[in-house]
Amino acid sequence: DVSFSIQQGEWVAIIGHNGSGKSTLLRCINLLEKPTDGKIIDNGKNVLERGYSLPKYRTHLGMVFQSFNLFNNMNVLENCTSGQMTVLKRNKEEAKKIALENLEKVGMARFIDAKPAQLSGGQKQRVAIARALSMDPDVLLFDEPTSALDPEMVGEVLKTMKNLAHTGLTMVIVTHEMEFARAVADRVIFLDSGKIVEEGSPEEFFTNPKTDRAKQFLNTFSYESV
């Protein structure tokens, strides 16, 4: 039972305990799971209404998963071009140019011939980010992008995401990285038992939480600078 809006160019961090519904909410936004009720309004139109083009809606959304979801039989470059050619109908040269630009952004351009099995977890996630960016999404969704990584690899992925800040891209990030959320988000949504318990700016939420539930949640974390 949630209701919120996202403005163009805004970075929204969704936080909460495990099982609070964070990932389910994200999957409902891009309709990997269909909501049982309610509305999802995109540019004034309800995407859940009959007749609305879901494939067209999904082209506006990029998603970065916990477990990378790269194609193991493809190299890094192919992972970043296949969707462009299949879904966006770009030719091979155009797709390659865009993929290389985005791989450069995430520091993975020199690994274009590597297969996923040859990469570390942090490198795989950076490739996944480049792949999502290569589809030119209006909104980029991150589902706990560091949760499957070894601790020493978390920083490189967070740094990559931080470098995307203020580029005009709209981002919704489900994360347990509290200091990261505090540093880069424009707004924080605290979810508990499938409901929005508190919502506000990072400064408001992290320094002066209004609800006891949010206070209890924050007391379980110690902050380190990202």
Residue ranges and their predicted role:
Residues 1-202:
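ABC family nucleotide-binding domain
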Residues 203-226:
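C-terminal boundary and immediately downstream tail of ABC-type ATPase nucleotide-binding domains
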